[in-house]
From Swiss-Prot:
The lineage of its organism: Bacteria, Pseudomonadati, Campylobacterota, Epsilonproteobacteria, Campylobacterales. GO terms for biological process: trans-translation. This is SsrA-binding protein. It comes from Helicobacter hepaticus (strain ATCC 51449 / 3B1). The keyword Repeat does not apply. GO terms for molecular function: RNA binding. Belongs to the SmpB family. Required for rescue of stalled ribosomes mediated by trans-translation. Binds to transfer-messenger RNA (tmRNA), required for stable association of tmRNA with ribosomes. tmRNA and SmpB together mimic tRNA shape, replacing the anticodon stem-loop with SmpB. tmRNA is encoded by the ssrA gene; the 2 termini fold to resemble tRNA(Ala) and it encodes a 'tag peptide', a short internal open reading frame. During trans-translation Ala-aminoacylated tmRNA acts like a tRNA, entering the A-site of stalled ribosomes, displacing the stalled mRNA. InterPro entries: SmpB, SsrA-bd_prot, SsrA-bd_prot_CS. One of its GO terms (cellular component) is cytosol.
Length: 155
């Protein structure tokens, strides 16, 4: 349960149908934690791979913060290990290999204990007509909200 969401992967909600989501920890360096606290993280185009029984986050961009230690500059797009139980990793790996599904991060947030957590999801790619359908649905909801708002003002 997120307390404060730092970054959302909006592209994942549009491109994929979310089947199952779960919470995982993430292994970070000190400067990366400071950058995340400052909100300098981007999850767009990031994905999760399971390698040798361990889950890794690839292509997540955590910007370097200039106020941190300057002699060591970490790679901003390095792979980061995810902290999951073995059963969860096995379940995800089975789903990915059998059903040709993917694992993507949805958002990064602070939990109640002020720890940085990553919400990951097992997803299936949407077809083009599904994407168009979701765009139409969003537009209709937006128009209905605007119409209700203007109707409320007239009363």
């Amino acid at each position: 349960m997120p307390i404060r969401v730092i970054a959302k992967n909006k592209k994942a909600y549009f491109d994929y149908e979310i089947l199952q989501s779960l919470e995982s920890g993430i292994v970070l360096q000190g400067s990366e934690v400071k950058s995340i606290r400052a909100g300098r993280v981007n999850l767009k185009d990031s994905f999760i791979k399971i390698i040798r029984g361990e889950a890794f986050l690839f292509n997540a961009h955590i910007s370097f913060l200039q106020t941190t230690y300057t002699h060591f500059k970490p790679n901003e797009r390095r792979e980061r290990k995810l902290l999951l139980h073995k059963k969860e990793i096995d379940k995800l790996f089975g789903s990915v290999s059998k059903e040709s599904l993917s694992i993507v991060p949805l958002n990064i947030y602070f939990n109640q204990k002020n720890k940085i957590k990553l919400c990951i999801a097992l997803v299936r790619g949407k077809k083009l007509h599904d994407k168009r359908e979701s765009i139409k649905k969003k537009m209709l909801e937006r128009e209905a909200r605007a119409h209700m708002k203007s109707y409320g003002k007239k009363l």
